[in-house]
């Protein structure tokens, strides 16, 4: 996507509703390559239940495999909350949150991994409260655009919960060990400027400009090489994610190699039942 005039980055976005079949989220796509997933439970500050997470997983998978989508926005309905974390009213006694059939889930962990491994940038658009599991979700996104009314923090130790995975380790990478311990141990809340100062968000904008500025950031990324963005995301993740991160980065390297004449020579030779001839390819220093 090319925007010859910078003012076009702020042009009104045309959203197409793709929400059929969903009850807890709204799912939309723009005409210029942006998908938007909105947690639609404002009556509970967009807290998620197992169904909410299941629908977000489905929508993000659709956005990943849609060739017309280059970047994804994750947000919450209304201006009062991005997401307040897991809905404590459906938290059960057997290790998770109950669905309508009584089965317990922690499927938000699957959604965290999905955001992390999605080869397309995922941008959190945060207004109001981003608390608990919702705070972890915004951290998992590649970028966070916050409204001036955004509030950030963890509540786990106050409600008998914690996220010892990315919610702790990745937070420490972002804000440092001491600050991460403060955020988790004290369960304080932080305003948007404080979050910006500690590196939890990328920018803070007036609430009225939140979507406009988020779309601008998305459109800027859409002008860049999708393969470069994909590999950069994998490389940045690999710094934190151990062998799983290396596997993701290596998979992208394999994909690039498959696109080369050298890689295709090996495949063609196998299919043609002949010895491959790699002598024509340079051995660069």
UniProtKB/Swiss-Prot annotation:
GO cellular component: cytosol
InterPro entries the record matches: ClpP/crotonase-like_dom_sf (IPR029045), DHNA-CoA_synthase_MenB (IPR010198), Enoyl-CoA_hyd/isom_CS (IPR018376), Enoyl-CoA_hydra/iso (IPR001753), Enoyl-CoA_hydra_C (IPR014748)
Transmembrane residue ranges: none
Residues binding hydrogencarbonate, per UniProt: 154-156
Cofactor names: hydrogencarbonate
EC number per UniProt: 4.1.3.36
Top-level lineage group: Bacteria
UniProt keyword Phosphoprotein, yes or no: no
Catalytic activity line of the entry: 2-succinylbenzoyl-CoA + H(+) = 1,4-dihydroxy-2-naphthoyl-CoA + H2O
Pathways per UniProt: Quinol/quinone metabolism; 1,4-dihydroxy-2-naphthoate biosynthesis; 1,4-dihydroxy-2-naphthoate from chorismate: step 6/7; Quinol/quinone metabolism; menaquinone biosynthesis
Gene3D superfamilies named among the record's database cross-references: 2-enoyl-CoA Hydratase, Chain A, domain 1 (3.90.226.10), Lyase 2-enoyl-coa Hydratase, Chain A, domain 2 (1.10.12.10)
GO biological process: menaquinone biosynthetic process
Enzyme class, broadest EC rank: lyase
Binding site for substrate: 45, 84-88, 97, 129-133, 155, 161, 258, 273
Residues the record marks as site: Important for catalysis: 97, 258
GO molecular function: 1,4-dihydroxy-2-naphthoyl-CoA synthase activity
Keywords in alphabetical order: Lyase, Menaquinone biosynthesis
Similarity-based family: Belongs to the enoyl-CoA hydratase/isomerase family. MenB subfamily.
PANTHER family noted in UniProt: 1,4-DIHYDROXY-2-NAPHTHOYL-COA SYNTHASE, PEROXISOMAL (PTHR43113:SF1), NUCLEOSIDE-DIPHOSPHATE-SUGAR EPIMERASE (PTHR43113)
Summary of the function given for this chain in its UniProt record: Converts o-succinylbenzoyl-CoA (OSB-CoA) to 1,4-dihydroxy-2-naphthoyl-CoA (DHNA-CoA).
Subunit relationships: Homohexamer.
UniProt protein name: 1,4-dihydroxy-2-naphthoyl-CoA synthase
The organism of origin for this protein: Salmonella typhimurium (strain LT2 / SGSC1412 / ATCC 700720)
Lineage: Bacteria, Pseudomonadati, Pseudomonadota, Gammaproteobacteria, Enterobacterales
């Amino acid at each position: 996507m090319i925007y010859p005039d910078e003012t076009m980055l702020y042009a009104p976005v045309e959203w197409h509703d793709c929400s059929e079949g969903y009850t807890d989220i709204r799912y939309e796509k723009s005409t210029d390559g942006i998908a938007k997933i909105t947690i639609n439970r404002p009556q509970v500050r967009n807290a998620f239940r197992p169904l909410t997470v299941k629908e977000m997983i489905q929508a993000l998978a659709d956005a990943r495999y849609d060739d017309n989508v280059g970047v994804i926005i994750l947000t919450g309905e209304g201006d009062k909350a991005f997401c307040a974390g897991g809905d404590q009213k459906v938290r059960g006694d057997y290790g998770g949150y109950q669905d309508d059939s009584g089965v317990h889930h922690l499927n938000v962990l699957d959604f965290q991994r999905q955001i992390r491994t999605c080869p397309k940038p995922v941008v959190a658009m945060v207004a109001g409260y981003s608390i608990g599991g919702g705070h972890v979700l915004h951290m998992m996104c590649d970028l966070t655009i916050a409204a001036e009314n955004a509030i950030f923090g963890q509540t786990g130790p106050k409600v008998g919960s914690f996220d010892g995975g990315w919610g702790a380790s990745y937070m420490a990478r972002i804000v440092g060990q001491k600050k991460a311990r403060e955020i988790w141990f004290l369960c304080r809340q932080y305003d948007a400027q404080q979050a910006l100062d500690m590196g939890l968000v990328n920018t803070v904008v007036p609430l009225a400009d939140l979507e406009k500025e988020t779309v601008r950031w998305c459109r800027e990324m859409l002008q860049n090489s999708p393969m470069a963005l994909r590999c950069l995301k994998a490389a940045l993740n690999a710094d934190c994610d151990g062998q799983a991160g290396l596997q993701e980065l290596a998979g992208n390297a394999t994909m690039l190699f498959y696109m080369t004449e050298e890689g295709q020579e090996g495949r063609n030779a196998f299919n043609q039942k002949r010895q491959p001839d790699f002598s024509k390819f340079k051995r660069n220093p």
